[in-house]
Amino acid sequence: MRLESYVQGRWIAPGGDWAGIRSAVTGAMVAEVAGGGLAMGEVLDHARRVGGPALRRLTFHQRAEMLKRLATYLNERRDGLYTLSHQTGATRADNLIDIDGGIGTLFVYASKGRRELPNATFLIDGAVEPLSRGGSFVGRHVMTPRHGCAVHINAFNFPCWGLLEKLAPAILAGVPVVTKPATITSYVAHALVRLIAESGILPDGALQCVVGPTGDLFDHLTGQDVVSFTGSADTAQLLQRHPVIAREAVHFVAERDSLNAAILGPDAGPGSPEFDLYVKEVAKEMTVKAGQKCTAIRRALAPREHVPAVIEALSRRLAGVKIGDPAREDVRMGPVVGLAQRRDVLARVEALKAEAELVFGDPARVAVEGADPEAGAFLPPLLLHCADPLRARQVHALEAFGPVCTVMGYDGLDEAATLANRGEGSLVASLYTHDPAAAADLVFGIGAYHGRLVVLDRDCAKEQTGHGSPMPHMMHGGPGRAGGGEELGGVRALHHYMQRTALQGSPAMLSRITGSWIRGAPEAIRPEHPFRCHFEDLEIGRSFHSAERTITLEDIEHFAHFTGDTFYAHMSEEATKGHPFFPGRVAHGYLLLSFAAGLFVDPDPGPVLANYGLDSLRFLKPLQPGEAIRVRLTAKEKSPRNAQYGEVRWDVEIQTAAGETAATYELLTMNAMRGA
């Protein structure tokens, strides 16, 4: 299978000499790649000129719907990816992480795009900022898609997940992608991109794939582009030093080496649920993907007195791991990705042995099921023990990217934190303790050095997603050695592909620009109640001003006894004497809300289908018996949901008869479309 690049809407064979890619399992040739023949400047230009405008014309909801259709399409055709992926050394369980996990990430971003983002082409970021005394000059931040290209350089270990977890937020943000898979597993990524291209779901130029060397691609980057890199620290540093990256201030997101730790708490001795969970997670992280995960546990920290028990329990569990042909159902660990990778892992283990003793596993003796241990890149799990981790250096600095972990003891939580932080920046650490005080000490002792912390105990053991699984909802990345970048994290990931801009102007102007009504902007008052308007007919700024209603003592007492809310401030003038907030007996805040609804609601059947919530409720002025209130209701924002209805966000202000603001909130309704 000769691998082509998918650029400018077609598959193009590279120039230059072909080089083979061998199966990690059998050593047989599975694919060929070559370099050269691609005009990288034209590839980037196609993304910027064709893909970018096509994506930016779509709203977040339309892009989200596109991601959902793509995820469904891939999910129905993933079996072929499974077959290919076995050649990389991946078991079926490994493929659940890589292939199903990647498709699942598309589904998550599709859902978040529909639920958490507006049906617009830009984002409003934060609240309105008053910039003048009289309120005629205000500020607001917006985020718009960059007019460049997202260049994604991926690692070999997750050819599907790595591609899709970067693709999803970029496409949702409205930025086209040029993806560059790692060569040794590029045949899996190539098959994935072929499926995406065949689906016809993404617009032309939204995704291009460069197989093989990137050539002079970096020479053509601009300040509107984004580079997202996953791989070794050495390669990341080389790319970040490229003169164009510095000159153009190209946004660079890096995820690099990481010496992740698992920390057994002082309370979690042998026999405890947390001890068993710790052993299970460490062993799993050593063997899933043959330990070739950026989030794998490389350092297993335990109270010094529990180290012998930890080594014994881990050795017993690792001894039961069946190694062999990953296509077999009974095999739990396949080979590393290739013979060169095996040599690299063994060389690094030898370096680690200068500070640590190999306590389980023998690289010269690997029992392999259904495959030739010499032809394939097989390794056994290798467990080391470092007796003096405070004085050691290599165990905190050198990553053997395979089924390798080092156990080390600590004396006290301060020392545990010191050892964890010796990794100089990690993607993740996991804590195994049922003691909240110990967990808090560790979280705040190591948080500055870690991108993610997982606290595991008996209460979450059955449903926890594991130390090494980055969830699309949560940020993935880490400081220092880990690269200083961030990926995923829900809609936070979109911010890498968007430009934040500060807008300043009058409330009227900014309301029109952003489609979000700002207090101080003109209101549109019509004879017809705004609740009688279908979604399409309701204009932003459409307002209703109610009549007044006086709050009586009888109202307050009836509400108190009817609801059971007999808080003293509503019931006793004497009890409120000297109160710092209340001048005397006051009305319930929720009584105000109820009266407000009675003042502004149009009761007859109509376009308003439901009120489904309140946001940002604040009670600003207490009201006493005898005071009157009135309500201003203004359509603030609209967002279509489907062909039948859309969401309307109303700005509501409850005022006193004197015009003082008593309460503010945002009311959410679903309004029907015409003809629905």
Question: What is the predicted role of each segment?
Answer:
Residues L195-G200, Q224-V226, D234-L390, L413-D414, ...:
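ALDH superfamily catalytic-core signature
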Residues L117-L277, Y410, E463, G485:
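Rossmann-like NAD(P) dinucleotide-binding subdomain of oxidoreductase/dehydrogenase enzymes
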Residues D17, M29-G36, G52-R56, P130-L131, ...:
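Short, well-ordered beta-strand elements within core beta-sheets of diverse protein domains
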Residues V25-A31, E65, S199-D204, G223-V226, ...:
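Conserved C-terminal structural/oligomerization subdomain of aldehyde/semialdehyde dehydrogenase
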Residues G578-A587, L591-K636:
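Hydrophobic beta-strand-centered segment that forms part of the acyl-chain substrate-binding groove
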Residues M1-G135, G320, V337, L346, ...:
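N-terminal Rossmann-like NAD(P)+-binding subdomain of aldehyde/semialdehyde dehydrogenases
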